[in-house]
Amino acid sequence: MYPAPDMSLWQGRIDSQEGADARRWHQWMRPYADDAEAASVLLGFASDEGVRRNQGRQGARHGPPALRRALANLAWHGEQAIYDAGDIVAGDDLEAAQERYAQRVADLLARGHRVVGLGGGHEIAYASFAGLARHLSRHERLPRIGILNFDAHFDLRHAERASSGTPFRQIAELCQASDWPFAYCCLGISRLSNTAALFDQAQRLGVRYLLDRQLQPWNLERSEAFLDSFLQSVDHLYLTVCLDVLPAAQAPGVSAPSAHGVEMPVVEHLVRRAKASGKLRLADIAELNPQLDSDQRTARIAARLVDSLVN
């Protein structure tokens, strides 16, 4: 059994005088049930144990409810149903929580839903991919899964235990054990936030990446071509956005704010482009830390990205 979602988070303005089309997220959201029609499902991963293990600033476990509150009052422009499936809460047993989250993702995908994960630290990424891999392995022997990560960091660290700095190394090891290709594309890498050892590791693993200074409006056509080339090489896409890819002025509420970062219009444009490929199977937003946020700026940006993924 999974805990029921806290529907009290879905509150906001009601513009009934403007008619039926004046809907907002909080009016459209429904609690998930197993007999729900295939639709978008929000699933939270309330964890910052991985951030703690990675020596970061804690508070991301409060990200999922903060993100729901930011979503609640946004105007709703979709026609399809949308459901809240509640949170998987990690505590200090991160590995067990990742397994529960992965199984929940696999079950939801098997029912035909489109899952959008709400973090939580970026340790959500390994759990998300594991769930997608579990689902696809039931139907394909050798699925070509692309991992598209908007992030200032490679998150390929060596460590004795899982953390927010290890998820894509864990995914690489999972792919190797399954004899699957490891197709990892990271957009927004900060050269000053990744050691030479991490760049060497990325090269050994065949990681495709663009630096934050390359992902700028004046270079958008090249960024689009780079992304399109990656998308053409895979059959299924897992997309994850670590909010520290954005400039600190836009997203202060993260463990490791970016001095440079990638502007929100560029990130949102490329997220929508990836979604338009028709290959997107699963997505999540990671590293929202409301305890470090200012005027809900980071939560509002995260909410806009979720809306871009759903509508």
Curated annotation (Swiss-Prot):
Class of this enzyme: hydrolase
Membrane-spanning parts: none
GO biological process: L-histidine catabolic process to glutamate and formamide; L-histidine catabolic process to glutamate and formate; putrescine biosynthetic process from arginine, via agmatine
Keywords: Histidine metabolism, Hydrolase, Manganese, Metal-binding
Catalytic activity: N-formimidoyl-L-glutamate + H2O = formamide + L-glutamate
Pathways involved: Amino-acid degradation; L-histidine degradation into L-glutamate; L-glutamate from N-formimidoyl-L-glutamate (hydrolase route): step 1/1
PROSITE patterns reported for this sequence: ARGINASE_2
InterPro entries per UniProt: HutG (IPR005923), Ureohydrolase (IPR006035), Ureohydrolase_dom_sf (IPR023696)
Manganese found in the keyword field: yes
Cofactor: Mn(2+)
Residues annotated for Mn(2+) 1 binding in this entry: 122, 151, 155, 242
Cofactor note: Binds 2 manganese ions per subunit.
Record carries keyword Hydrolase: yes
The EC number(s) this enzyme carries: 3.5.3.8
Binding site for Mn(2+) 2: 151, 153, 242, 244
A Pfam family it matches: Arginase
Any one Gene Ontology molecular-function term assigned to this protein's record: agmatinase activity
Protein's job: Catalyzes the conversion of N-formimidoyl-L-glutamate to L-glutamate and formamide.
Similarity comment: family membership: Belongs to the arginase family.
Name of the protein in its database record: Formimidoylglutamase
